[in-house]
Amino acid sequence: MKDQLQPGVSLALLTAYQVGGPAEWYLQPTKAEVLDEALGWARRSELPVTVIGAGTNLLISDVGIGGLVVHLRSWRGTQILEEGLIEVKAGESIAALAFQTARRGWAGLEWAVGVPGSIGGAVVMNAGAHGAQFSDTLESVEVLTETGERRRVAAGELGLTYRSSLLQQRDWVVLSARLRLAPGHQPARLIEHIDEFNTFRHRTQPSGFPNCGSVFRNPGGEKKAGWMLDRSGLKGQSVGAAQVAEQHANFILNRGGATARDILTLMTRMRDRVVADWGIALKPEVRFLGRGLNWAG
C-alpha cells in the first residue's frame, strides 16, 4: 500500500472547477485490500480521510486538503444481480450507467445522462434532475465505516432528501450502490427520453468553461434558485476569473485562473444579494473541502 500513497498531489485537475491545492497524501485504489490498509494506516496515524469521486460537486481550498485523500475514480464495476437489479461500484459514471441501462430496456436513470458525477457522489448528494433523484431507484449501499467495518445500509436509513443524505455527516466510504430499475421497456423509447433531456441540458446550461453545475440548491416553493439569481441581476458578475454564467445564473464558470477563494467570494455575494432581494438564504449544492474554506450561513 505504501508504494501507492503519493504525497502532495495537486487536486485541481481532478475537479470540475479545476481549482484547489494539493492533497497531503493521495491514494487511488483499485483493490479492497489496498483501501482497507490505507484507511487503517490513516486511523493509526490520526489523519483525517477525505473521499472524492468524479470531483463534479466540490470546491477544494487553494491550500489543499490535509490528511489522506482517497480518490475512487478507478473503483469501478457493475454486477447484474437479477433482471433490473444491479450493484454498481462507487467510481462508475452515473451518466454512462444511464445509457447502459436504457439500452437494456431498464427505466429509471434516464434523467442522469447529463449528470457528470460518479455513483458514490450521487448517493451522498442524492443527485437529481428533471424532477427525479437517485433515491428513486436506490435500494441499499455498501459502506466502509470509520472503524473499518463493511456494512450494508438500506436506502431508508440514509435520510435521503433533496440533495442531501446522512452520509454527508458520517465518516463513511461509499463502496457501491444497489439499484432497482424497471425492466421491460423499449430501449429505443428510453434513448429517445435521454436525447430529450440532453437537448434541454445543452440549450439551458453553459459549457466551454470549467464549472460544477448548479451552485445552490432550489429552496422549495415556486421560486427556483436560478430564477432569483437572474432577477437579482447576477448574470455576468465576477470575482477574479470566476464569473456567474450569462446562460444560467446558478452556474459559476472558471474563465481561466480562478481560485477557490474567488468562487467562494462570488458565491457569498450571490447569496447575500438574494437574501436582500428575496429574503431567502440559498444553501450551497457544492461541498467545501480543505483548509481555510468555510461557508458562513
From Swiss-Prot:
Kindly list the cofactors needed.
FAD
Enzyme class, UniProt record, top EC level? oxidoreductase
Catalytic residue positions: 163, 214, 285
Q: Its Gene Ontology molecular function terms?
A: FAD binding; flavin adenine dinucleotide binding; UDP-N-acetylmuramate dehydrogenase activity
Described purpose of this protein according to its UniProt entry: Cell wall formation.
Q: Is this entry keyworded Cytoplasm?
A: yes
Q: What reaction is this protein's catalytic activity? A: UDP-N-acetyl-alpha-D-muramate + NADP(+) = UDP-N-acetyl-3-O-(1-carboxyvinyl)-alpha-D-glucosamine + NADPH + H(+)
Show the HAMAP family listed in the entry: MurB
Gene for this chain: murB
In this chain the FAD-binding PCMH-type domain maps to 18-184
Naturally occurring in which organism (per UniProt): Gloeobacter violaceus (strain ATCC 29082 / PCC 7421)
Q: Name one GO cellular component term.
A: cytosol
Family matches, as InterPro entries: FAD-bd_PCMH, FAD-bd_PCMH-like_sf, FAD-bd_PCMH_sub1, FAD-bd_PCMH_sub2, MurB, MurB_C, MurB_C_sf, Oxid_FAD_bind_N
The name this protein carries in UniProt is UDP-N-acetylenolpyruvoylglucosamine reductase
| Keywords from the named record | Cell cycle, Cell division, Cell shape, Cell wall biogenesis/degradation, Cytoplasm, FAD, Flavoprotein, NADP, Oxidoreductase, Peptidoglycan synthesis
Q: Name one GO biological process term.
A: regulation of cell shape
Q: What is its EC number?
A: 1.3.1.98
Question: Does the keyword section mention Cell wall biogenesis/degradation?
Answer: yes
Please name the pathway. Answer: Cell wall biogenesis; peptidoglycan biosynthesis
Under Pfam families, the record lists:
FAD_binding_4, MurB_C
Name the Gene3D superfamilies for this protein.
Answer: 3.30.465.10, UDP-N-acetylenolpyruvoylglucosamine reductase, C-terminal domain, Uridine Diphospho-n-acetylenolpyruvylglucosamine Reductase, domain 2
**UniProt cross-references to PROSITE patterns, sorted A to Z:** FAD_PCMH (PS51387)
- Compartments where found: Cytoplasm
